[in-house]
A protein has these predicted regions:
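N-terminal presequence-like segments and the immediate start of the first folded domain
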Residues: 4-8, 16-76, 80-93, 98-145
Length: 145
């Protein structure tokens, strides 16, 4: 009987450890999704942020057509979503940057760097067509210890 109790206890403990909790993150301080997706999804200690373009969260309109202005707006939008979930830019471990023109790389990079301390996340940058004629879109993954 003790053997069965020990096996049952072990099964229950291992089952609890493998449970993943999924939570949708949404904030009015960042633009609402313009399609069938969430601003972010948190699974346990990992936060997956959807790509953000330079939409003003209040008006829903694109900000000025300059890469520096758009990059700041995108990072502020991402910061609002991070904050809503209890994360910060210090928790970001990976990002993907999409540019409409690779000539925007240097000015985007300068603004992007302002949001990270000495240990920026891993990152990829690619050129692609973007919705609403955006100049930049950025998506991120953040991880809590």
């Amino acid at each position: 009987m003790n053997r069965i109790a020990v096996l049952l206890l072990a099964f229950v403990l291992f089952s609890c450890e493998s449970v993943n909790t999924k939570r949708v993150i949404s904030t009015d301080n960042a633009p609402q999704a313009i399609g069938p997706y969430s601003q972010a999804i948190q699974v346990n200690n990992t936060l997956y942020l959807a790509g953000q373009i330079a939409l003003d969260p209040i008006t829903g309109q694109m900000v000025e057509d300059k890469i520096e202005v758009q990059t700041h707006r995108v990072m502020k939008n991402l910061g609002a979503v991070l904050s809503e979930a209890g994360f910060s830019f210090d928790d970001v471990v990976q990002s993907q940057v999409f540019l409409s023109d690779l000539n925007h790389y240097k000015p985007m990079n300068k603004i992007y760097a302002e949001y990270f301390n000495s240990e920026p996340p891993a990152r990829a940058v690619v050129q692609t067509a973007l919705p609403r004629d955006a100049l930049v879109e950025i998506m991120m993954v953040a991880q809590k210890p």
